[in-house]
Amino acid sequence: MILLNLMLYFCSMQTTSTEIKKKCIRSLSAEELKDFFVASGEKAFRSRQVYEWLWKRSARSFEQMTNLSKETRTLLENNFSINPVTISQKQVSTDGTIKFGFKLHDGYLVEGVLIPADDRMTACISSQVGCSLTCKFCATGYMDRKRNLEPYEIYDQVVLIKEAAEEHYQTPLTNIVLMGMGEPLLNYTNVLKGIDKVTSEEGLHIASKRITLSTAGIAKMITKLGDEKVKFRLALSLHAANDVKRNTIMPINETNNLNVLKESLLHFCKETGSSVTFEYIVFDGVNDTAQDAKELYAFAKNIPCKINIIEYNPIQEADFMNTSVDKLEQFKKVLTDKGIIVNIRRSRGKDIDAACGQLAIKEVK
């Protein structure tokens, strides 16, 4: 009876109507895929073959699954879609950075970036189509959020950027940062599932410590990351250690103020044993004074951390200005003199709008 019900369930996916979409096969667990094959009268081991094609071998069509019979491939084609992410646009910066426009199965576009460096090859990927937050310095913040990305769409971005790294630089991908379009912690479940596939042996088997999730600061979700003892790195997009200033730059601070954020970060560090990275864009006349640096030290001093000071990358929608090199160095010195680890991060891909804060694809659908 169970097998009959399963068969009826999966057969119900078949339709001649163009109005009903096929279920994406990559939304099934390994066990659900096995159940489908058994209910269809196929050998259970076929599910393992297909699962390997879908994840480890990143098949983009059922026709690529050459160790399956034509009948089995037709069965899959009639019941499922794969919904692969494809590259619709590509731009190469003078510094070697490559920006991608990724097209999703429903026509929406998101952006990702390959950032080459002497000691690493980094993929910057998106977690949402658009963003519901309204950070004033970020181009994505001026777009509406259309939808969350599915786990397989997060995974596919990594696969495509990994292939580009090998093609253009003959170098493997070493790092992944979720710093593209969207707020990852507002797509919590799908992002963690996507990371799980990227790190698993059945997927790309990339070490968790090579992955960094960047958030604007959703305190309760940072606490949840700590509770789940995640293995990947966490970065907080901070940009001011003063609630009044941060409210202006990042309105999310009005509901996730600095005290609440500090509490959640301390919990995260305690539960995971990891440090965090604070990202701090220095804007001329806004947050670049010695007093701002002292406030940043006061916020960070009891949290295991390092601080990345970032050059501002101009966008059309905002009138912020980059601070001077002298002010940048003075700001850094205030922190390093107090024992804080500080890096100044130079912009990459600015000439193709691929730098931090510049991702906002011109054509959304």
UniProtKB/Swiss-Prot annotation:
Disulfide pattern: C124-C356
Active site: E111, C356
GO cellular component: cytoplasm
UniProt cofactor(s): [4Fe-4S] cluster
Residues binding S-adenosyl-L-methionine: G182, E183, S214, S237, L238, H239, N313
Biological process according to GO: rRNA base methylation; tRNA methylation
One Pfam family hit: RlmN_N
Record-annotated Radical SAM core domain positions: 117-351
Co-factor binding details: Binds 1 [4Fe-4S] cluster. The cluster is coordinated with 3 cysteines and an exchangeable S-adenosyl-L-methionine.
Record field: catalytic activity: adenosine(2503) in 23S rRNA + 2 reduced [2Fe-2S]-[ferredoxin] + 2 S-adenosyl-L-methionine = 2-methyladenosine(2503) in 23S rRNA + 5'-deoxyadenosine + L-methionine + 2 oxidized [2Fe-2S]-[ferredoxin] + S-adenosyl-L-homocysteine; adenosine(37) in tRNA + 2 reduced [2Fe-2S]-[ferredoxin] + 2 S-adenosyl-L-methionine = 2-methyladenosine(37) in tRNA + 5'-deoxyadenosine + L-methionine + 2 oxidized [2Fe-2S]-[ferredoxin] + S-adenosyl-L-homocysteine
EC class of the enzyme, as a word: transferase
Keywords: 4Fe-4S, Cytoplasm, Disulfide bond, Iron, Iron-sulfur, Metal-binding, Methyltransferase, rRNA processing, S-adenosyl-L-methionine, Transferase, tRNA processing
Cross-referenced InterPro entries: Aldolase_TIM, Methyltransferase_A, RlmN_N, RNA_MTrfase_RlmN, rRNA_lsu_MTrfase_RlmN/Cfr, rSAM
Keyword 4Fe-4S: yes
Residues noted as binding [4Fe-4S] cluster in the record, renumbered to the chain: C131, C135, C138
Recorded GO MF terms: 4 iron, 4 sulfur cluster binding; metal ion binding; rRNA (adenine(2503)-C2-)-methyltransferase activity; rRNA binding; tRNA (adenine(37)-C2)-methyltransferase activity; tRNA binding
Cellular localization per UniProt: Cytoplasm
Gene3D superfamilies (UniProt xref): 1.10.150.530, Aldolase class I
Record PANTHER family: 23S RRNA METHYLTRANSFERASE, RADICAL SAM CORE DOMAIN-CONTAINING PROTEIN
Function of the protein: Specifically methylates position 2 of adenine 2503 in 23S rRNA and position 2 of adenine 37 in tRNAs.
HAMAP family: RNA_methyltr_RlmN
Miscellaneous comment as given in the Swiss-Prot or TrEMBL entry: Reaction proceeds by a ping-pong mechanism involving intermediate methylation of a conserved cysteine residue.
Family of the protein in this entry: Belongs to the radical SAM superfamily. RlmN family.
The protein, known as: Probable dual-specificity RNA methyltransferase RlmN
Source organism per UniProt: Cytophaga hutchinsonii (strain ATCC 33406 / DSM 1761 / CIP 103989 / NBRC 15051 / NCIMB 9469 / D465)
Gene: rlmN
